[in-house]
């Protein structure tokens, strides 16, 4: 079907988002067309602001408005423990349970040879550098319980063990193949409490 060019561009833009196919993109584009102009302007501004006003923490890699982020700046945090996660949504999920008091390191992905993603393509080199500078006693590997997450956890574990840092993995209770961000607070809390050494 041929759409006016502005609608086609909007549909193409929506399709760049994960999980948005042609039909959903079309539905969203026509919904935007029906919105009040003020709401569309506010929506567009929010999209631009998220790119312009946020950055990644130079210490942990978490999204932030100021560098270092509020977590790395918090002097009450236990600096001897770092929880390594795949993405920012995982930090948010962990923080919701209000039990973990250590620091984080965000990888921004997982090792996935099938997708051409190796250890150098995610935030692993900065983690190793960070471990040299800080007095970390434990590294909690909180990758998603899927093939990529397990591969990433094993890779990091092998790199870190010779340094003499205790490496633990979240307890299973998280479903295999599931994502950390969708786990409820109770499940996450139990997984943290029952973590195992690697």
From Swiss-Prot:
Membrane-spanning ranges: none
The keyword Zinc-finger appears for this protein: yes
GO biological process: DNA recombination; DNA repair
UniProt keyword annotation of DNA repair present: yes
Database matches in CDD domains: TOPRIM_recR
Toprim domain segment(s): 80-175
Pfam family, any one: Toprim_4
An example Gene Ontology molecular-function term: DNA binding
Stretches annotated zinc finger (C4-type): 57-72
Keywords assigned: DNA damage, DNA recombination, DNA repair, Metal-binding, Zinc, Zinc-finger
InterPro entries per the UniProt record, alphabetical: DNA_Rcmb_RecR, Hlx-hairpin-Hlx_DNA-bd_motif, Rcmb_RecR, Rcmb_RecR_Znf, TOPRIM_dom, TOPRIM_RecR
Gene3D superfamilies: 3.30.60.80, 3.40.1360.10, 6.10.250.240, RecR Domain 1
NCBIfam families, per database record: recR (TIGR00615)
HAMAP family per the UniProt record, alphabetical: RecR
General function of this protein: May play a role in DNA repair. It seems to be involved in an RecBC-independent recombinational process of DNA repair. It may act with RecF and RecO.
Sequence similarity: Belongs to the RecR family.
Protein name as catalogued: Recombination protein RecR
Organism encoding this protein: Staphylococcus carnosus (strain TM300)
Gene name of this polypeptide: recR
């Amino acid at each position: 079907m041929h759409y006016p060019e502005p609608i086609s561009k909007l549909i193409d833009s929506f399709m760049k988002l994960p999980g948005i196919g042609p039909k959903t993109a079309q539905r969203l584009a026509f919904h935007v067309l029906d919105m009040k102009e003020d709401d569309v302007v506010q929506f567009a501004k929010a999209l631009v602001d998220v790119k312009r006003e946020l950055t990644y923490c130079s210490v942990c890699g978490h999204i932030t408005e100021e560098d270092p982020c509020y977590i790395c700046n918090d002097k009450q945090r236990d600096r001897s423990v770092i929880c390594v996660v795949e993405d920012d949504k995982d930090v948010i999920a962990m923080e919701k349970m209000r039990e973990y008091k250590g620091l984080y390191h965000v990888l921004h992905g997982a090792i996935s040879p099938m997708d051409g993603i190796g250890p150098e393509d995610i935030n692993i080199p900065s983690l190793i550098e960070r471990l040299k500078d800080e007095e970390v006693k434990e590294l909690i590997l909180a990758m998603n319980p899927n093939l990529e997450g397990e591969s990433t956890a094993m890779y990091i574990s092998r790199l870190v063990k010779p340094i003499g840092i205790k490496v633990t993995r979240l307890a299973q209770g998280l479903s295999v193949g599931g994502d950390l961000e969708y786990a409820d607070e109770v499940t996450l809390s139990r997984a943290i409490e029952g973590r195992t050494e690697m």
